[in-house]
């Protein structure tokens, strides 16, 4: 009432527990809509940045910009000779979507005699198990490698000219760039070698083998390939390479190992097609991914909190929006609306999962921000800066339902029974908001019609049981079994279609007849030169209409050839974590016993591992178990040294997601939360994506006794090596 509804920022996204009735993604949004609205945090396509901002304009695939991969498991088994796991770790980033199926598939492909090649700076957990060959590349330099491959194909006549002529537009622009471009520098393997760290002979061998054998590229999410500076360039360059070898022909496609059937879309599953696709939206008691005019992209939240003048950007940025949406400009605040004064969040993981986390911690202490309300099952990260934390019940403490239609195993609707009573005062997210509604109704409902019957209007009179039944009756499961039978059995399953082997795989229809089966681009073809980008951003020198080589610029200096590298000589790889889901499970005692999960320092503190190549460790005088600072001009965090040949020289590796343990909030951290020192800048000038991997850092050996004397308050906090810092350090 003091500032207006737009003054409340709602943070309502993230990777939470699987809940439909008691969801953890914006249960408060509807309540605030009943009271006039709020400003939403719009989560940009953080797992798909390069694809969304780049490849989507090349092959038009909606909504994420990744390739069609329907029925590809069958096609690969029959036709593919080589799989390129490019920046892909399908042993780590499957998480709740894929379970063990991606791992089993990779073993199956090997058993079928298919060659597997891993391209990544690190010998990750998938490459260590499945790859026949590892090609280590410097982080965020895949673009140089890709251009050099294209150079070999063009100069040695190793690409499909007929396909390029009939299925693409703008190839002459790519050829111009490969053969010299504006700076007259041919993108030869010898040119690429010092940039990407891959020997010229290896580049040539890879290019020739790819041209000779049916090849499919493979991906999961995360890593420097798709979440770094100008990630739209390697993403759309990969599409160009696939096109040069006849994208869609048997064995030549793009496969993704996770998020199958995402958004109930059968184009995005390499597994046998199901008769129906389950949905859980009918009884979903939280926010939906849709467009609104009152929002801020998640990557711009620090700027939005601290704003004193309007800020602008392009697109709603949420992952379900079509490519055309990226051409529309928005601003915060809207004309005549307030700036931010309050945050209500169920997503307290911004600081350790997004770009420029230190900037966010500074913003949380802006004088204009009056109040931060947080609800969450776990006390992590941003919770340190909340005024009130509402304890949320976990999945095991409530009755709910769930859908498994992304694992590729069985399309299943599940009844999730309550396992235990809620601990202490914990309530579900939905119930927490109901309690707020009750209080508001009690305080204001008698005299103000806005608050009258607020609880009833918020819940629509639904109970847990009626919400489950409503969800079931609109899920497609009701076509196969009754609600009563579902409750008795605890699940309902959707069968595969008969003769699923006959389904055309990937881009085969487009390959066979591009005129009859056009792509959703303006021309209907693969647009190596994007007409949409040319029309809407003719002066954008970072994301041009066609792929171009770009490295150090006024915007980014995160490259080894930049003068900044003299001070900060190592490129940091920060992937999705092997032993966590983002920040979740960072306090798991059993996982912390694994040597690549935590490194116990001389002070007994469990530090986040920093993988360092033996060559670099020798140069720095480091040994296993030493404690180091990971530092750049945005601040520093810490880590425990883990010396291994599994990381390329001049590169260091530290997973993202360690729970922050601030030394000086907004400047330094003990726990290894390296997103704090990631660039605050977005993917490029007109692309509000995150840059959270592939940036420059320095490594400094630390004497833990001396640093404890320097920062006595931070280093005197109580902690348990098998859990982390004690909650008593923070809760009042």
Residue ranges and their predicted role:
Residues 1-9, 73-83, 184, 204-218, ...:
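Glycine-rich phosphate/diphosphate-binding loops that line cofactor/substrate pockets in enzymes
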Residues 370-371, 377, 417-437, 629:
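Phosphate/diphosphate-binding loops
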Residues 111-113, 122-214:
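Long, well-ordered, tryptophan-enriched scaffold segments
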Residues 1-158, 294, 346, 438, ...:
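N-terminal export/assembly segments and adjacent metallocofactor-ligating motifs
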Residues 130-136, 402, 411-422:
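Short beta-alpha connecting loops at secondary-structure transitions
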Residues 23-119, 143-147, 239-384, 394-398, ...:
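Extended redox/cofactor-interaction regions of prokaryotic respiratory oxidoreductases
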Residues 228, 429-489, 585, 589-611, ...:
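Long, contiguous, secondary-structure-rich segments that constitute the structural scaffold
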Residues 125, 381-415:
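Flexible glycine/proline-rich, aromatic-decorated loop/lid segments
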């Amino acid at each position: 009432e003091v500032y207006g509804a737009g003054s409340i920022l709602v943070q309502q996204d993230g990777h939470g527990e699987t809940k439909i009735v008691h969801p953890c993604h914006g249960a408060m949004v509807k309540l605030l809509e009943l009271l006039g609205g709020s400003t939403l945090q719009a989560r940009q396509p953080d797992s798909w940045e390069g694809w969304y901002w780049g490849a989507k304009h090349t092959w038009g695939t909606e909504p994420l910009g990744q390739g069609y991969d329907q029925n590809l498991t069958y096609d690969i088994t029959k036709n593919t000779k080589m799989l390129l796991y490019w920046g892909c770790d399908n042993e780590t980033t499957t998480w709740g979507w894929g379970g063990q199926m991606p791992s089993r598939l990779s073993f199956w492909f090997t058993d079928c005699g298919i060659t597997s090649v891993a391209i990544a700076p690190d010998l990750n957990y998938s490459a260590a198990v499945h790859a026949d060959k590892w090609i280590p590349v410097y982080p965020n330099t895949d673009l140089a490698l890709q251009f050099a491959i294209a150079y070999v194909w063009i100069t040695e006549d190793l690409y499909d000219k007929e396909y390029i002529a009939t299925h693409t537009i703008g190839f002459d622009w790519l050829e111009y760039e490969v053969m010299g471009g504006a700076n007259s520098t041919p993108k030869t393997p010898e040119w690429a070698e010092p940039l990407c760290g891959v020997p010229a002979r290896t580049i040539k061998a890879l290019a020739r083998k790819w041209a000779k054998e049916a090849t499919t590229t493979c991906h999961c999410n995360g890593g420097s390939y798709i979440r770094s500076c100008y990630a739209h360039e390697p993403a759309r360059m990969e599409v160009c390479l696939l096109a040069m070898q006849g994208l869609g022909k048997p064995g030549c496609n793009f496969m993704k190992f996770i998020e199958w059937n995402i958004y109930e879309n059968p184009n995005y599953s390499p597994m046998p097609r199901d008769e129906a696709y389950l949905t859980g939206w009918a009884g979903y008691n939280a926010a939906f991914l849709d467009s609104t005019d009152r929002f801020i992209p998640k990557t711009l939240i620090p700027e939005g909190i601290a704003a004193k003048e309007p800020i602008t950007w392009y697109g709603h940025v949420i992952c379900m929006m079509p490519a055309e949406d990226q051409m529309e400009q928005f601003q915060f605040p809207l004309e005549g609306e307030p700036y931010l004064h309050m945050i209500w969040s169920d997503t307290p993981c911004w600081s350790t999962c997004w770009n420029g986390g230190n900037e966010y911690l500074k913003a949380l202490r802006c004088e204009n921000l009056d109040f931060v309300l947080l609800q969450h099952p776990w006390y992590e990260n941003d919770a340190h800066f909340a005024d009130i934390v509402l304890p949320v019940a976990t999945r095991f403490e409530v009755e709910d339902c769930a859908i498994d239609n992304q694992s590729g195993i069985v399309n299943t609707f599940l009844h999730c029974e309550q396992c235990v009573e809620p601990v202490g005062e914990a309530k579900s997210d939905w119930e927490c908001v109901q309690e707020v509604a009750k209080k508001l109704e009690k305080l204001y409902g008698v005299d103000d019609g806005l608050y009258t019957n607020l609880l009833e209007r918020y819940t629509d009179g639904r109970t847990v049981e009626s919400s489950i039944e409503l969800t079931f009756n609109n899920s497609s499961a009701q076509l196969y079994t009754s609600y009563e039978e579902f409750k008795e059995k605890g699940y309902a399953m959707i069968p595969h279609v008969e003769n699923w082997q006959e389904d055309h795989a990937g881009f085969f229809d487009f390959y066979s007849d591009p005129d009859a089966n056009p792509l959703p681009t303006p021309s209907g073809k693969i647009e190596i030169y994007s007409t949409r980008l040319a029309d809407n951003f003719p002066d954008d020198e970072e994301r041009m209409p066609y792929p171009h080589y770009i490295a150090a610029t006024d915007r980014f200096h995160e490259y080894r050839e930049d003068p900044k590298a003299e001070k900060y000589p190592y490129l940091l790889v920060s992937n999705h974590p092997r032993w966590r889901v983002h920040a979740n499970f960072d306090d798991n005692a059993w996982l912390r016993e694994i040597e690549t999960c935590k490194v116990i320092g001389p002070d007994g503190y469990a530090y986040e591992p920093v993988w360092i190549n033996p060559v670099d460790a020798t140069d720095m005088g480091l040994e296993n178990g030493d404690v180091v600072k990971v530092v750049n001009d945005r601040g520093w965090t810490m880590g425990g040294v883990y010396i291994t040949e599994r990381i390329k020289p001049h590169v260091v590796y530290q997973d993202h997601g360690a729970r922050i343990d601030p030394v000086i909030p907004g400047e330094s951290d003990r726990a290894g939360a390296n997103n704090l020192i990631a660039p605050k800048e977005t993917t490029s000038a007109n692309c509000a994506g995150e840059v959270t991997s592939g940036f420059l850092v320095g490594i400094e050996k630390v004497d833990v006794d001396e640093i404890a004397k320097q920062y006595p308050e931070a280093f005197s906090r109580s902690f348990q090596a098998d859990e982390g810092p004690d909650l008593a350090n923070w809760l009042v």
